């Protein structure tokens, strides 16, 4: 969680790496980092010729390397985002040759969800040396409640302990699912509101008396 914030903050400061390998069980942080790169690294004018999204089920590692080696057009950088890269798990180590000598004018983002990358293998070591490698781990229930409070606080809301527990009990630890439900609350309630079980029942439809036992 904190590491994801550090990665985004570094990008905000202009500290942009040539390769980001984002992997792990929690899709939420992978999406947040890749979406931030997609939104902020290039200007809207630059994106037309210099930003592309590839899907792991449709491409090979060689396709990815070929696109990453292109030069940007009328821009300092190009951005290549590979979504669903977990479909390339059998050949992912073939990325080593590129990761060892990445194109510095390319920002290559690999979104490798729901999979582990073996830390003992060459690719993990090379990306760690030349770029950013981030493991997005599932949060435990007690960590999700803490994340929920911080997430809302950063957006001008607070939440009662009972309401936070209600959301986690009902929705589990899937941060993407929780985030979507929080959007409903943010649309319905003004900032500075403390979210209560009654708000959750009214706007999300989870009974304030819900108990999964």
Indicate residue ranges for each PLM-predicted region.
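Conserved beta/loop motifs at nucleotide-recognition and modification sites
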Residues: 1-213
